[in-house]
Amino acid sequence: MTASLKAIDGSAELTTLMTDLGRQARAAARTLALAPPEQKNRALEAMERAIRAGADKILAANAEDVADAKAAGTTSAFLDRLTLTPARVEAMAEGIAVVRGIADPVGTVTESWQRPNGMTIERVRVPLGVVAVIFESRPNVAADAGVLCLKSGNAVILRGGSESFRSCRAIHDRLVQGLREAGLPDAAITLVPTRDRAAVGLLLAGLDGSVDVIVPRGGKSLVARVESEARVPVFAHLEGVNHVYVDRSADLEMAKSIVLNAKMRRTGVCGAAETLLIDRAAATTHLAPLVTMLIDSGCEVRGDQTVQQVDPRVKPASDEDWDTEYLDAVIAAKLVDGVDGAIVHIHNHGSHHTDAIVAEDAQAAAKFLGEVDSAIVLHNASTQFADGGEFGFGAEIGIATGKFHARGPVGAEQLTTFKYRIHGSGQTRP
């Protein structure tokens, strides 16, 4: 039985609570690792129904969180990330349906070969175990992480931001309902039942060996703390200082469409473009139309000296602007010396998240895609496609920007590791 959602008083009680949560999650992970795909899919189907049936309660809980956030004077970008709408709740349910429909990664034989001595060796996907997901303002992460971990046979411990506490609790209630309908343990998806920030430190310490991997979803300070203090492996989800480079060969109308979508579709998501780079050779044809379009669409443009000259509404860019994830209707813009200049700028200022080139020149595109060292690189497409759902994963637990184990959108398959199965017929080693 999981811990009740109650106020926690005192560090000793919190430590006991968190340790118990870890042990329960570890026990649930052993059950999930052996659960057949049909049982996991029954749970996912029940969760999808429960999210839709409980939409009013989820939205009511979210409205309370949003009201508190507004009273605290939070930014519009933060409020956008925090806010749920009927459409966003429906998207949550639809995401669960997609996850249910993807192939179960657990037990998949990824490679098989036979040795000269007759032994057969297989590499097989297996769950990671217990995943701790620490996130900030986005309540939908609770659903995404919960269902992806379930699909991949992992137990998950969710620790959402205090600002989204009620929303996460309402979503978690529906996920647990689905687990119960399928006969799976409640502790397969656990929500840390307190706003106490000390709970994060206990998670980072690994809960006495119960946590196998930590996934942080949030701003630079959260990710930095996790990477600094964690005693278990981390799938780092760094900030998205994302670039769109418009090459001299770019079709102007395509460039305008991509740049506008990459920046303004949703400014508060990690796939939003934060810097616009324009080929100096295209300055006379592409610069003014792109800058004017952005400003007329409500986006503040901060530019270098040349960019400032094309529209009096452009504000001067500071050195800090080239390294900033705004998550708001603000973009930095500058001219660069062709694709090589764009690559150098991204190397110096990017966050290895998502970067795009708009170009008709196939050689320029190939150079950009090959040399920009980011988890996601795009040719003639918006950076806002940096999303597990758009990759066909149904959802994502984060965008991993590191290079070990997982990179890019972390879906169900990326939440597995592997083991080797060896079949012999009495072989002994000479």
Swiss-Prot record:
GO terms for cellular component: cytoplasm. Its EC number is 1.2.1.41. The keyword Electron transport does not apply. This is Gamma-glutamyl phosphate reductase. Keywords: Amino-acid biosynthesis, Cytoplasm, NADP, Oxidoreductase, Proline biosynthesis. GO terms for molecular function: glutamate-5-semialdehyde dehydrogenase activity; NADP binding. Belongs to the gamma-glutamyl phosphate reductase family. GO terms for biological process: L-proline biosynthetic process. It catalyses: L-glutamate 5-semialdehyde + phosphate + NADP(+) = L-glutamyl 5-phosphate + NADPH + H(+). NCBIfam families: PRK00197.1 (NF001221), proA (TIGR00407). It is found in: Cytoplasm. Transmembrane segments: none annotated. The keyword Cytoplasm applies. Pathway: Amino-acid biosynthesis; L-proline biosynthesis; L-glutamate 5-semialdehyde from L-glutamate: step 2/2. It comes from the Bacteria. Catalyzes the NADPH-dependent reduction of L-glutamate 5-phosphate into L-glutamate 5-semialdehyde and phosphate. The product spontaneously undergoes cyclization to form 1-pyrroline-5-carboxylate.
